[in-house]
Amino acid sequence: MSSNPDQSTEVLYSVDSYVATITLNAPERLNTISGRMLDELSAALLKANSDMSVRCIILTGAGRAFCAGLDLAAQMSGPKDSLGNMGNIGASAGEFDIRNAPPVVLHNIDTPVICALNGGAAGYGLDLAFGCDI
């Protein structure tokens, strides 16, 4: 089974020969994690885990880095909350469900995940790498 990746997202998903490949797709910013990427990554991991034809997941990054951590530029330009905290990574505390965070999803899925490090992994990117099985 094979499916073509959707190029309009920050996370690419494809399946070929029982292997799902999930690619962080923001090479121009070294695949730094945005709120949108968090949501798309969790959704892709859950999709692969629920697909009975997928026996293994490969997590990788596009370009010259795996993931350089959180997108601090977006955080600095985002709105400030009432406590002065900056950023737009994820939703407000009342709306964000930690059970949907990619490291938690990685810990809870049954399908083995291989991290294909194609370059640097820093901060949150290192958390993602450590969350993989291999």
Q: What is the predicted role of each segment?
A:
Residues 1-62, 78:
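Conserved CoA-thioester-binding segment of acyl-CoA-metabolizing enzymes
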Residues 25, 70, 118:
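Histidine-centered beta-alpha loop that forms part of the nucleotide-sugar donor binding/catalytic region
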Residues 5, 61-105, 121:
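Glycine- (often His-adjacent) and acidic-residue-rich active-site loop
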Residues 22, 59, 71, 128-130:
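Hydrophobic/aromatic residues within transmembrane alpha-helices
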